[in-house]
């Protein structure tokens, strides 16, 4: 149970920390986001921050929920169109877990080629990848600190955990989560809660991963409801971002469980939001485990 913890992502947190993005990246930047984040005004803010530092930035803003291999392929083609074979020096993911997963997948394909299915369950061969700066606008997936990307197989519809590099840096700015609709915030929080529970009880947990699972649970227990009831409570929103990252680190160093496995078909076949699906399955899994010790 005692194994060294692996934390591959440097965390920058605090209100207004989005402005630190221009101090982190340099050279050619490729920004990956979605239409909702554009509409919320976050993309314009970040582009202005880059422009003030004369940082070249091209944008891809067509990420969809529950991204597929085709989504990553389209993003990779946009990167090629923007910067040619030289590629980008940094990929910046601004959005929820879908945007971050597409960015990680795009970085992998740009360096190693192929399709996402080629990296199902394992890391790509040693090729230098463009680093990813993850800037989550939801507090839930933990993708900002994980090396695997959750991508849908175009042929089977199954979710694939595809190996790659974890983001080099993640910015946790609670200002960015205020634009979340209440339903999105609730589903994201349920995802973090499920991550904390499942990583705490998995058979492959370690002492270190259990520490992060417990920290995530502590933060969720104290801040989930306040973050929903008082959307402008930036302390609660910041705590939920930290909870998401802590649970993500626990996942990276252990495993998830049946609630996530059972949720994936719901998202694939019924287009249910990931956090909602996990939240619906978790009580049944907890009850089953309690009755079958």
Residue ranges of predicted features:
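ATP/NTP phosphate-donor binding region
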Residues: 1-90
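A glycine/threonine-rich phosphate-anchoring loop and its flanking beta-alpha core
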Residues: 9, 111-207, 292
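Structural motif
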Residues: 10, 29-30, 58, 89-92, ...
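Short glycine/serine/threonine-rich phosphate/pyrophosphate-binding segments
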Residues: 15, 39-42, 69, 98-104, ...
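Short Gly/Thr/Asp-enriched flexible loops that form oxyanion-binding sites at enzyme active sites
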Residues: 46, 74-76, 99-112, 145-146
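Glycine/serine-rich anion-binding loops at beta->alpha junctions
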Residues: 88-106, 137-143, 271-272
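Active-site segments that bind and position negatively charged phosphate/pyrophosphate groups
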Residues: 199-293
């Amino acid at each position: 149970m005692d194994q060294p913890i692996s934390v591959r992502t440097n965390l920058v947190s605090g209100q207004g920390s989005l402005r630190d993005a221009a101090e982190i990246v340099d050279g050619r930047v490729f920004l990956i986001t979605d239409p909702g984040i554009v509409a919320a005004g976050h993309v314009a803010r970040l582009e202005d921050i880059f422009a003030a530092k004369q940082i070249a930035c091209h944008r891809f803003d067509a990420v969809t929920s529950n991204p597929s291999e085709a989504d990553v392929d389209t993003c990779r083609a946009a990167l090629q169109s923007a910067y040619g074979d030289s590629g980008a020096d940094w990929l910046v993911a601004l959005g929820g877990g879908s945007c971050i997963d597409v960015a990680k997948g795009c970085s992998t394909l740009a360096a190693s080629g192929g399709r996402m299915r080629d990296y199902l369950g394992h890391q790509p061969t040693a090729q230098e990848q463009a680093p990813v700066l993850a800037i989550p606008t939801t507090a839930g997936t933990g993708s900002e600190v994980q090396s695997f990307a959750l991508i849908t197989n175009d042929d089977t519809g199954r979710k694939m955990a595809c190996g790659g590099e974890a983001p080099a840096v993640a910015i946790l700015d609670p200002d960015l989560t205020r634009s979340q609709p209440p339903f999105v915030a609730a589903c994201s929080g349920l995802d973090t809660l499920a991550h904390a529970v499942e990583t705490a009880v998995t058979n492959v947990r370690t002492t270190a991963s259990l520490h992060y699972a417990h920290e995530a649970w502590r933060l969720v227990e104290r801040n989930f409801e306040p973050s929903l009831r008082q959307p402008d409570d930036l302390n609660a929103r910041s705590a939920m971002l930290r909870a998401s990252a802590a649970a993500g680190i626990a996942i990276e160093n252990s495993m998830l469980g049946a609630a996530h496995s059972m949720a994936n078909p719901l998202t694939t076949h019924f287009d249910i939001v990931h956090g909602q699906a996990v939240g619906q399955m978790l009580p049944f899994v907890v009850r089953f485990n309690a009755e079958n010790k």
